[in-house]
């Protein structure tokens, strides 16, 4: 695997950004700029990554491309298309978003209707529109696996890949996001095996974090830093590396640079 972090770390220039990641022993990065930052800035960060020997794991969208308001929805679809084109130009492993929802105030929130046939059809059309307009050749567009919206399981991911029917659509695997039951939690080693067995050949990037069962009733899971939970991280890394020796694995959702550095050191000690 190639280890990276979602933090861009505090930096004053593209060169400092790249060197800080390299100094931590990282091999890949999340791209910290995008289509709204201008071509010169994008090129400068890409060159800095190349000079430091860092691959680019992902370009993020993180906008509601299924927003209820039609104008807002189209605005974010257009943004996603431009982000895919940036990812393609710089050779990122993927451009990634979550599917989004029109059914509530939180754009990435959990609602019953997220699992409706209406949402499914909207999502397939949206993904195809982004891919068919951007027409990437050197990257994949991905929808990250999630706990309360599609895709929320390996089987659902496979159905989505089949429904979208585009070779430019890939899997962005976040295993922790899909650990939503006692069985998946306590037997996460088996769930990891299931994910990589079923999604083999489609996975282009992974998120890396941990998960812990809280002692209070009823069933409550808490995302946490690597090593602070019960996920079989060593197995996760082994499976990802078997899928692709250069598989990006991105540590995410920590607060400070110091927390990211601590998590990096833990993962490096594991593998």
Enumerate the language-model features and the residues they cover:
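Short, electropositive alpha-helical surface patch
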Residues: 111-119, 150-165, 221-236, 259-271
């Amino acid at each position: 695997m190639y280890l990276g972090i979602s933090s861009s770390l505090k930096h004053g220039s593209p060169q400092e950004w790249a060197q800080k990641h390299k100094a931590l022993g990282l091999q890949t990065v999340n791209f910290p700029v995008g289509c709204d930052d201008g071509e010169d800035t994008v090129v400068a960060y890409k060159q800095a990554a190349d000079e430091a020997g860092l691959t680019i794991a992902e370009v993020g969208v993180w906008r509601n491309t299924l927003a209820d308001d039609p104008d807002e929805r189209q605005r974010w679809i257009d943004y996603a298309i431009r982000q895919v084109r940036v990812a393609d130009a710089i050779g990122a492993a993927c451009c990634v978003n979550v599917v989004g929802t029109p059914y509530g105030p939180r754009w990435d929130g959990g609602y019953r209707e997220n699992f409706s046939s209406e949402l499914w059809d909207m999502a397939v059309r949206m993904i195809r529109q982004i891919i068919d307009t951007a027409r990437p050749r050197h990257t994949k567009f991905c929808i990250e696996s999630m706990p309360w919206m599609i895709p929320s399981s390996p089987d659902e991911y496979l159905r989505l890949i089949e429904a979208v029917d585009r070779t430019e659509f890939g899997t962005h695997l976040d295993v922790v996001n899909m650990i939503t039951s006692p069985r998946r939690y306590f037997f996460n080693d088996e769930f990891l095996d299931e994910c990589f067995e079923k999604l083999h050949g489609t996975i282009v990037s992974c998120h890396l974090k941990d998960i812990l069962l809280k002692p209070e009733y009823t069933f409550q899971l808490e995302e946490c830093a690597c090593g602070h939970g019960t996920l079989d991280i060593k197995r996760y890394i082994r499976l990802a590396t078997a899928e692709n020796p250069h598989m990006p694995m991105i540590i995410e959702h920590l607060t400070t640079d110091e927390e990211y550095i601590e998590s990096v050191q833990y993962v490096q000690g594991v593998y």
